[in-house]
């Protein structure tokens, strides 16, 4: 009999390092790739893996995310175990504290244990909603069952110099976890490879009994911790639970012959920009065109992209770029850029290495270079952005350490 698997996506992250893109939306709701939201990749991983029972746990500035899920992610009304349901923080009442919001990743799940009970889950897959990657959850689940584990953690080998930003594991020769350290200042390396650490991707599969016991112990019982990485996983090891690591690099993706190496935490503006620019390269690391691993999102009703004018010096043209529906390149040039829905660039404008969100308009003779423009911005004719950072800062734009300029949503010139 096929096990009952419940998917839970943690989508309440604030994403403060992505400001100003997260001033009015949560991190999982940030647009990516011209037509997607960051959360779409976690949802697609579940659906492409045959997990159709999904709860999305939301908290911080969730309206944009709520509208996206409700508009674009719906199953038929007659399929009982096929659902994608939003679960906002509902001020769960603790006897000693009164009503509280989600206080951490583990607390978000703890406050919704009744959903797991009602579903009668055998296994619970708890995944982060703010990373860019593909993952065959079914393969990870099979590894979890084969190992007879209580908890399985998706693991990503990473250079030790960067591992301090993540949870780090030590494992034995069978990949059973022997130690878990959350964001250690001096991450341990792997045996035989001291320059590489085994980091947690923030994706877990729990056997239901172990999950319920650990959450009750960590949150409502003897413990005082509300986070999986800081509290629940170290507690699981201390209490003798079988905690297994799962090698993400061995995760098979249908239609992809190369090893599965791509996983990005686009938690900073520079990381977000770098991941975006990968998509427009000739051979991107992250392939969004694999028909055997479709990437669904909210349906768009925009007309096809359009290029107009062909006079010399005024040709509507784009090179090495992604253009969503409704885009009009009207006598301007676009290079190495991502243009989201209903963007319009006017004659003699030049857009280079940029990410433009929905409903951005670029005026005549304007020049943009290495710029992220949030939605609903009208850029006047002759405007230059990204070419003089002092001028950009004077307008109130964010300029990153790598020189990426960010224009906030609905900015008025």
Swiss-Prot record:
Major enzyme class: transferase
Catalysed reaction equations from the record: alpha-D-glucose 1-phosphate + ATP + H(+) = ADP-alpha-D-glucose + diphosphate
EC number: 2.7.7.27
InterPro entries, per database record: ADP-Glc_PPase, ADP_Glu_pyroP_CS, GlgC_bac, GlmU/GlgC-like_hexapep, NTP_transferase_dom, Nucleotide-diphossugar_trans, Trimer_LpxA-like_sf
Gene: glgC
UniProt xrefs under PANTHER family: GLUCOSE-1-PHOSPHATE ADENYLYLTRANSFERASE, GLUCOSE-1-PHOSPHATE ADENYLYLTRANSFERASE-RELATED
Annotated keywords: ATP-binding, Carbohydrate metabolism, Glycogen biosynthesis, Glycogen metabolism, Nucleotide-binding, Nucleotidyltransferase, Transferase
Keyword Protease belongs to the record: no
Task of the protein: Involved in the biosynthesis of ADP-glucose, a building block required for the elongation reactions to produce glycogen. Catalyzes the reaction between ATP and alpha-D-glucose 1-phosphate (G1P) to produce pyrophosphate and ADP-Glc.
Bilayer-spanning residue ranges: none
Subunit and partners: Homotetramer.
CDD domains reported for this sequence: ADP_Glucose_PP, LbH_G1P_AT_C
Tree of life domain: Bacteria
PROSITE patterns associated with the record: ADP_GLC_PYROPHOSPH_1, ADP_GLC_PYROPHOSPH_2
UniProt GO BP: glycogen biosynthetic process
Name listed for the protein in its UniProt record: Glucose-1-phosphate adenylyltransferase
Signal peptide: none
Residues where alpha-D-glucose 1-phosphate binds: 102, 167, 182-183, 200
Organism: Deinococcus geothermalis (strain DSM 11300 / CIP 105573 / AG-3a)
Molecular function in Gene Ontology: ATP binding; glucose-1-phosphate adenylyltransferase activity
Pathway recorded for this protein: Glycan biosynthesis; glycogen biosynthesis
Keyword rRNA processing recorded: no
